[in-house]
Amino acid sequence: VFSSPILPEFLTGYECVKFFMDINSASIRNPKPLDGYFEEMSIAPEDRDKLLKDYSHGMKNKMQMLINIIAQPNILLLDEPLTSLDVVVAEEMKNLLRSLKDGRITIFSTHILDLALDLCDEIVLLSHGELEVVEKSNLDDHAFKEKIIAALKEESYA
């Protein structure tokens, strides 16, 4: 799932989901009725018939996640899943990510350290082009957290 949603904006929400389900019907396990998926993502009935081009950024992100819920991938790769979302949608997305991590590998990039602490079993920090495993127990230490933030600041201004 991309931080900037990529969707067929000439379709409505219903058309997009139906099209996806039709072309992937052989691989979708235990499909639900369309409305069930929209309800799971808190997409209101009046929004389901709107063209995707008229959806807000947050609604487009919800549609991308809806497609992933239907596809049920074993590995879910997300780029900044909460970027540009309002507080309500961000909280919904965080709860969804928490529920989706059961039974699959979820990998996501984020600049929100508290989000990583809340949702991740393991945290890896990308600094100066190198990956470094961060022990979550160290993140309870305020000084260690400050060290990470300082390193990230240094890198972003370099």
Give residue spans per PLM region:
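Conserved ABC ATPase signature
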Residues: 51-58
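Conserved H-loop
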Residues: 103-109
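Catalytic Walker B motif of ABC-type/P-loop ATPase nucleotide-binding domains
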Residues: 76-80
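Helix N-cap at the start of a conserved alpha-helix in ABC-type nucleotide-binding domains
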Residues: 87-89
